[in-house]
Curated annotation (Swiss-Prot):
Enzyme class (EC, first level): transferase
GO cellular component: cytosol
UniProt similarity note: Belongs to the Fmt family.
Gene name of the record: fmt
Keyword presence, Protein biosynthesis: yes
Protein name stated in the entry: Methionyl-tRNA formyltransferase
InterPro entries linked: Fmt, Formyl_trans_C, Formyl_transf_N, Formyl_transf_N_sf, Formyl_transferase-like_C_sf, Met-tRNA-FMT_C, Met-tRNA-FMT_N
Residues reported in the UniProt entry to bind (6S)-5,6,7,8-tetrahydrofolate: S109, L110, L111, P112
HAMAP family: Formyl_trans (MF_00182)
Length: 312
């Protein structure tokens, strides 16, 4: 089929690769405009943009798909279908109705749970046992269209947003060509989403990344894993040169009792919850400002935290 692919982050790259491998004609790839990245904050293309260019595919990076110019350019592609995977923009009706067979979205949750921008992170932070990937026909509402196919994925005890991202990307990239083949032959069954159990995965904001040690150990653990590796849940630790920001990248819940935020041993067991009733979390991986991510043992060699140290 002649299709357009709309995607931006790393999650979308494998999906585009599978569609190319399946022999579809990629008329155009759409992605978000280049953005400041890295320490130098230089403008760099998105992962999808860079990958598409490496394949010699035409790329457009509009600030908005809502302008008359972009709508007309999209129509002029004369598409059979459009595939959207974490593009990052809302598509208006004129865009959705332009392809002959419609626009289809790969979404990283089991809809209607976790509609919206951050389904992977929110599923872990909420303590969900399972999540998944689904292909749906797009409508004007946010992730409200009928579902064509999907697959469940278990969320393991030490799952992070990063590891779950990779699992879901692998499942989704395999699913997309199968879904498009069914759509092309007219054999795709569309199931309306339930009106019950609707939740929204709000975009992760930097302000919510700081760890609140007064929450229970289970909540702190999910917070850490749900925000790992990006943006990274963080706390401040005392040092000879003042407070140092540390990102906690992996943790597990353990028994322990103490004032919230206080180290219970010299191996990163931190008390959680109010009144000593919240348990504790063991930090398994951490990262200081200006340093790379390190396993706890290596981290402590360069930045020891003794029992009784209060973290903020």
């Amino acid at each position: 089929m002649r299709i357009a692919f709309l995607g931006t982050p790393e999650f979308s790259v494998a999906c585009l690769a599978e569609l190319v491998a399946a022999g579809h004609e990629i008329a155009c790839v759409y992605s978000q405009p280049p953005a400041p990245r890295g320490r130098g904050q230089d403008l760099k293309p998105s992962p999808v943009h860079a990958f598409a260019e490496s394949l010699g595919l035409p790329v457009r990076t509009p600030v908005s798909m809502k302008t008359a110019e972009e709508i007309e350019a999209f129509r002029a592609l004369d598409l059979d279908a459009a595939v959207v995977v974490a593009f990052g923009q809302i598509l208006v009706r004129d865009v959705l109705e332009a392809p002959r067979l419609g626009c289809f979205n790969l979404h990283a949750s089991l809809l209607p749970r976790w509609r919206g921008a951050a389904p992977i992170q929110r599923a872990i932070m909420a303590g969900d046992a399972v999540t998944g990937v689904q292909v749906m026909r797009m409508s004007e509402g946010l992730d409200e269209g009928p579902v064509l196919m999907g697959e469940q994925v278990r969320i393991d005890a030490l799952e992070t947003a990063g590891t779950l991202h990779d699992k879901l990307a692998a499942v989704g990239s395999r699913m997309l060509p199968v879904a498009l083949a069914a759509i092309e032959r007219g054999g795709a069954r569309e199931t309306p989403q339930s009106e019950e159990g609707v939740t929204y995965a709000k975009k992760i904001k930097a302000a919510e990344a700081r760890i609140d040690w007064t929450r229970s150990a289970a909540e702190v653990d999910r917070h850490i894993r749900g925000l790992s590796p990006f943006p990274g849940a963080w706390f401040e630790a005392p040092s000879e040169k003042g407070s140092v920001r540390v990102k906690a990248l992996l943790s597990r819940v353990e028994d322990g009792e103490g004032a919230p935020g206080v180290a219970l041993d010299d191996a990163l067991l931190i008390a959680c919850g109010a009144n000593g009733e919240g348990g504790a979390v063991r930090l398994l991986k951490a990262q200081r400002e200006g340093k790379g991510a390190q396993d706890a043992e290596v981290f402590l060699r360069g930045f020891p935290l003794a029992a009784g140290t209060a973290l903020a």
